[in-house]
């Protein structure tokens, strides 16, 4: 559809822990679309969003919201109710992918390789017992992650029970549920997919430690290799095949990013899908698009062109 004659709202900011990143993503999309001559308004989302959308006469929404209330199907459902087409996955796909436990169960049921994990709620006594069970089955490092946040907010890498318990407490401070996931040693890769088209793989190489929030959004903390070097054809094909399968199984559309670990034997392990990838100057999806000659204005326009209801 041609959106040139429509009033476009870039929805950004919001109420989650990822607000600051969202503001940067939204600003990048706003500038890109404005440079192409679109009628675009940047809207910082709060609890009065319905009134703002009506007042501004928004006819299509470009979503740059990260985390809860933005990537979990909430804003998508509101826009469906208001009859405003929007970018990215629909309500169901957004909810599935935002819930790391739910999406991993779906991956596992469909035969897609994903690291072993357990899920924990706010009951610390139960958490202690489950961590003991996890340690009985697996040795070495694990990652503790909130089940419904992105941008590596609240994530810890832990070895041993004491670190795991501290990691669980940290994760539960930002969410009422978390998971302990077996750490797979290997290369960190990410695959950006736009409307079913896979972009070149990126290898993520943190200067030190693991790829946490600071490494993601602080210049100079991480090296990004585009395309990922020294990948044999078999591993490359496997990553793309698994990423596209996950994209379709979850019902995704638009721009989505799949994160992987490639172990020492060349086996890719699917970690998660990100349904509204970051669009900042350090973000991965724009880097992958650039590698195939798609600059930010064109990427923003392609994202916009995929806007729809349901």
From Swiss-Prot:
Keywords: ATP-binding, Cell shape, Cell wall biogenesis/degradation, Cytoplasm, Ligase, Magnesium, Manganese, Metal-binding, Nucleotide-binding, Peptidoglycan synthesis. Residues 104-305 form the ATP-grasp domain. ATP binds at residues 135-190. It is found in: Cytoplasm. Mg(2+) 2 binds at residues 272, 274. It holds the Pfam family Dala_Dala_lig_N. GO terms for biological process: cell wall organization; peptidoglycan biosynthetic process; regulation of cell shape. It catalyses: 2 D-alanine + ATP = D-alanyl-D-alanine + ADP + phosphate + H(+). It comes from the Bacteria. Cell wall formation. This is D-alanine--D-alanine ligase. It comes from Magnetococcus marinus (strain ATCC BAA-1437 / JCM 17883 / MC-1). The gene is ddl.
